Curated annotation (Swiss-Prot):
Catalytic function, reaction form: Hydrolysis of alpha-(2->3)-, alpha-(2->6)-, alpha-(2->8)- glycosidic linkages of terminal sialic acid residues in oligosaccharides, glycoproteins, glycolipids, colominic acid and synthetic substrates
Ranges in the topological domain labelled Intravirion: 1-14
Entry domain remark: Intact N-terminus is essential for virion morphogenesis. Possesses two apical sorting signals, one in the ectodomain, which is likely to be a glycan, and the other in the transmembrane domain. The transmembrane domain also plays a role in lipid raft association.
SUPFAM superfamilies per UniProt: Sialidases (SSF50939)
Name of the protein: Neuraminidase
Lineage: superkingdom: Viruses
Virion surface side: 36-470
PTM description: N-glycosylated.
Taxonomic source organism: Influenza A virus (strain A/Equine/Tennessee/5/1986 H3N8)
Function: Catalyzes the removal of terminal sialic acid residues from viral and cellular glycoconjugates. Cleaves off the terminal sialic acids on the glycosylated HA during virus budding to facilitate virus release. Additionally helps virus spread through the circulation by further removing sialic acids from the cell surface. These cleavages prevent self-aggregation and ensure the efficient spread of the progeny virus from cell to cell. Otherwise, infection would be limited to one round of replication.
GO molecular function terms attached to this record: exo-alpha-sialidase activity; metal ion binding
Length: 470
């Protein structure tokens, strides 16, 4: 075969392959159209394709026309049901670590807020850490003087549990130097107290929008729990104090629906003092263990019913759980009266387990260092000293601080009971350490049906920071 014949043969073969390829494509298109039409899903160039992307604060709907995109924003659908929260507390044999934010360690080189009073609260889908910022960052000049409790720069913010209180993930909640927050199953409600000491105001936000307010009724530093409020069947409850920190003050229970106050009642507690209650739901009622900042080293107990009737007294146990306090052996316990004659105090918590009680306390009797949780047999109803369980959370070589309670709802756990959980604040900086600032991180623990070994989950930041050396 001469060269011309070879060229003709190759060209003919190529042309044949090309024609076959075209035929196959035509057949493919015909088959596709027939199949789509038979299935009722034939596409029209004038039709639309809608894709929805669920984001944190909105649903983004993208409508794709032929050669055109139209983007519109539609309201994110809210949860349909209120949480029940009438289940009993689960029995806890020990407490397992749930989260640790390490905020101060990260903040030595990261954009982390200076905070105090962190606490945790949960919705049906997530738990969040709330905290009161000082309007400044760690290792920055504006952190100077942040040992002060109340200032116009303080705000309530939140992050998903386990995240550090950093600039990039924090969500603004309220202007506040005292606060509480909880979720009713549909939306978050926050109560943020701010303003001058003699005319402070509490703003109730629901779904991020101001809905109601509470003005100071005693003109002496209106304040609230610094931990989670409690929602039962859509009604949310919290406790507030107005008046002196070192003598008789005035105390009120508030009840709100969808962020609007629908009830309140004064607590009659002559001779007793209530501040910074740590509350949780249990069998349809709200149970609180509070702080007596006047005289008692035993903790006030408050049990609230849905009609705002209440019982108030002191944790009966013959072991004191406030700080400062005396020796355990010298304490007798009382269900009705403050004992110990030690002023000041620290926010704390406990959980009723039948007639027993789990109670948290600092290991030190005189300072906010170390932390342990102990189980006292019949400690809810009797002056019992029978300590049947002890778990160390922070050893006594490291700083602790406030502590408080919350529960995991059944929507999260799929259990038939509410899991008891607590957090412990670890305060660093002033007044105990040589820094220009005061801030804290936290460790969070949740009840399990197994014993858990003691350990020290302390803060671990190495101080002072660079800003403290200038």
């Amino acid at each position: 075969m001469n060269p011309n014949q070879k060229i003709i043969a190759i060209g003919s073969a190529s042309l044949g392959i090309l024609i076959l390829n075209v035929i196959l494509h035509v057949v493919s298109i015909i088959v596709t159209v027939l199949v789509l039409n038979n299935n009722g899903t034939g596409l029209n160039c004038n039709g639309t394709i809608i894709r929805e992307y669920n984001e944190t604060v909105r649903v983004e709907r993208i409508t794709q026309w032929y050669n055109t995109n139209t983007i519109e924003y539609i309201e994110r659908p809210s949860n349909e049901y209120y949480m029940n929260n009438t289940e009993p507390l689960c029995e806890a044999q020990g407490f397992a670590p749930f989260s640790k934010d390490n905020g101060i360690r990260i903040g030595s080189r990261g954009h982390v807020f200076v905070i105090r009073e962190p606490f945790v609260s949960c919705s049906p889908s997530e738990c969040r850490t709330f905290f009161l910022t000082q309007g400044s960052l760690l290792n920055d000049k504006h952190s100077n003087g942040t040992v002060k409790d109340r200032s116009p720069y303080r705000t309530l913010m939140s992050v998903k549990i386990g995240q550090s209180p950093n600039v990039y993930q924090a969500r603004f909640e309220s202007v506040a130097w005292s606060a509480t927050a909880c979720h009713d199953g549909k939306k978050w409600m926050t109560v943020g107290v701010t303003g001058p000491d003699n005319q402070a105001v509490a703003v109730v936000n629901y779904g991020g929008v101001p809905v109601d307010i509470i003005n100071s009724w005693a003109g002496d530093i209106l304040r609230t729990q610094e931990s989670s409020c409690t929602c039962i069947k859509g009604d949310c409850y919290w406790v507030m104090t107005d008046g002196p920190a070192n003598r008789q003050a005035k105390y009120r229970i508030f009840k709100a629906k969808d962020g609007r106050i629908i009830g309140q009642t004064d607590i009659s507690f002559n001779g007793g003092h209530i501040e910074e209650c740590s509350c949780y739901p249990n069998e349809g009622k709200v149970e609180c263990i509070c702080r007596d900042n006047w005289t008692g080293t035993n903790r006030p107990i408050l049990v609230i019913s849905s009609d705002l009737s209440y019982t108030v007294g002191y944790l009966c146990a013959g072991i004191p759980t406030d700080t400062p306090r005396g020796e355990d052996s010298q304490f007798t316990g009382s269900c009705t009266s403050p004992l110990g004659n030690k002023g000041y105090g620290v926010k704390g918590f406990g959980f009723r387990q039948g007639t027993d009680v789990w109670a948290g306390r600092t290991i030190s009797r005189t300072s906010r260092s170390g932390f342990e949780i102990i189980k006292i047999r019949n400690g809810w109803t009797q002056n019992s000293k029978d300590q049947i369980r002890r778990q160390v959370i922070i050893d006594n070589l490291n700083w602790s601080g406030y502590s408080g309670s919350f529960t995991l709802p059944v929507e999260l756990t799929k259990k038939g009971c509410l899991v008891p959980c607590f957090w412990v604040e670890m305060i660093r900086g002033k007044p105990e350490e040589t820094t220009i600032w005061t801030s804290s991180s936290s460790i969070v623990m949740c009840g399990v049906d197994h014993k858990i070994a003691s350990w020290s989950w302390h803060d671990g930041a190495i101080l002072p920071f660079d800003i403290d050396k200038m």
